[in-house]
């Protein structure tokens, strides 16, 4: 067994990667690591981080014992000093030593308490304090149902927030225990839940058995059918909060049993049966004892034991050593706090991190339309009118500010005749809201659960309107007889379906207000106009600060991906903050394949000898498209099985295929291979049909778009991707408002920053597309880069190292054909 307990004999590149990761963690740095798909990246990261975790736990334990012994020795030495000259000094030193002793003992006791809790979990024990704290806001609700939409008291003394309420609910330890149980951990974040599940499967291949939990949304983990049927996450979240609020506390259950009450109240009937602390603790025990390692297992156990899997997962996080979580839980400040994620002294791994800056920008974006603002304004006004006698002065101030802000936003949007871009300061001046403190307004909405109250008020108004529509006027006895006599028999009307759940517009409004609390220079407000409505859209221009908040909080951060290059923008972004350049490590792996398994060439001239460069000016020209189509036709017969051709955009793709058809070239290509085209529709079966055809002796071609769904996440291994052809350099559209603003912002932050972003977006997309092929050690493929700009050294340096170092340039088309033929003949004999 090697130094990292790798489950197989590791390749040199895997050992190098694991050593680099371990060193990065030990030195408390930020690492940017590129490891091509097919090189065992996930296993390498897991084995290196788990090896460090084991060693660090042992080091901490040994260090505490050693330090405690040294302190005891120091105290004993101080006690032996009796001379008058040294006595005062000895007393001071002894007091300092005793303070250190207390600190060490607290750490040792905390570790012992944690181990005791794990032992309890393994025995399946659930310790419930006799003095269990009941959720504060549930205490009186069971006995006297309240108006859930009613305004709160002065919000500084308001009811407990959802997080506080859940904390009380989970407070199963004695009040004397001040510090929560927690341990050293690895936070491993990836884009999707399926990728996290794959990581758990990879871990199962190793000898490591850390306490592991996978964070997921309520939509993924909820087992309450009444809630799950709502489908949409925001509706699921709202329903979950509503049912938990309606549930009675443990104290109330005891009171009811003592009174012998059997009648179910309305509140009790609409609570969640799975929100039960004892049953939730059962599920937590399963996680901490390593019996439940996946979201599927946790969900099954939760349903079986009537314990909520979502809250069991949340409660398990502090005591788990490996926490798998989606990007949004780690990278979004509010979500991270809601989950109780503590980064201090822990290690972060961000998988597929090439797009981390765009991901953060997306997580902090917000928008609101005239339709939502109109409905929100109506709700706020009706709410204020309905509760005007209950609103305290402080609450009334904020509610009037909210009404004023909403009204001014709506008036401004309706008055706009064209699209516009503005800073947050400009928006405040345009709306004339300089007197409104948006920070305090957002805080008020958060602490009073205002969105939730409005949702209850909104749903109640909807029900009342439907009820009014269904009500018939009351008739006297004679009127009923006359009406029955005059009326012709009618078929019995079908009952009206229940109203579809609609989210309250206050959630969108609050998200937008939250966005406005970012630094003025860090964001832009875009006003969008369409034929039917207008909207405000907030765009975060500076995700660097948000990323810095995360990485500087942790002990070390590992940014890893199959295509991290070009990484210069990421490095510059991190360096602009409080992170010094010397704190960043970079490492790029070679591929596990041999040079003989990859043919990578730039196609600078087409088959007719003409220079090829696909630019905005040339991409629609018949001469350009004919030369390109003829070259593809000449190349295809020499490539077996599947060929994937990536083009810059859907518009180019459809025009190119139309022209190939006009030229008669498409028909000749189809005689050699079946041709398929990526659809804009997400439900298309093109992939399945291409996969079947590619494995035949004739083979198949798939035309796809760089940046489309086929260029990221799809596995073109073996026969599915014997060749990848990339047409042109897929630069993003510079007329895009978002891109233009981001480039302008980066130009103010660093020299040539906008162009660096422009180049990075293009080359990341190219590297992602190329990375779809060659997915394992014995795979092989050819890569053709159609554009003479790929021959430039500056462009090739932005390719992933394993591609750029192997790319051949300055070849004639005839030589490319000969190399292609030789390449596939040699590999077919292996």
Curated annotation (Swiss-Prot):
Alphabetical GO biological process terms: DNA repair; establishment of sister chromatid cohesion; positive regulation of cell population proliferation
Q: List the catalysed reactions.
A: Couples ATP hydrolysis with the unwinding of duplex DNA at the replication fork by translocating in the 5'-3' direction. This creates two antiparallel DNA single strands (ssDNA). The leading ssDNA polymer is the template for DNA polymerase III holoenzyme which synthesizes a continuous strand; ATP + H2O = ADP + phosphate + H(+)
Indicate which residues the UniProt annotation says bind ATP: 35-42
Knockout: what is the outcome? Uncoordinated and sterile with cell proliferation defects in germ and somatic cells. Hermaphrodite gonads have fewer cells with 13% of homozygotes having only one gonad arm. Most hermaphrodite mutants contain sperm but only 20% contain oocytes that develop as far as diakinesis and those that develop exhibit abnormal karyotypes. Mutant adults contain significantly fewer D neurons and seam cells than wild type. No poly-guanine tract deletions but double mutants of chl-1 and dog-1 display increased deletion frequency when compared to dog-1 mutants.
Annotated GO CC locations: nucleus
Q: Which residues form the signal peptide?
A: none
Compartments, as annotated in UniProt:
Nucleus
Give the location of motif DEAH box in residue numbers: 351-354
Describe cofactor binding as the record notes it.
Binds 1 [4Fe-4S] cluster.
Which molecular-function annotation in GO is an example for this chain?
iron-sulfur cluster binding
Main localization of the protein?
nucleus
From the Swiss-Prot or TrEMBL record, give the protein name. Answer: ATP-dependent DNA helicase chl-1
| Source species of the chain | Caenorhabditis elegans
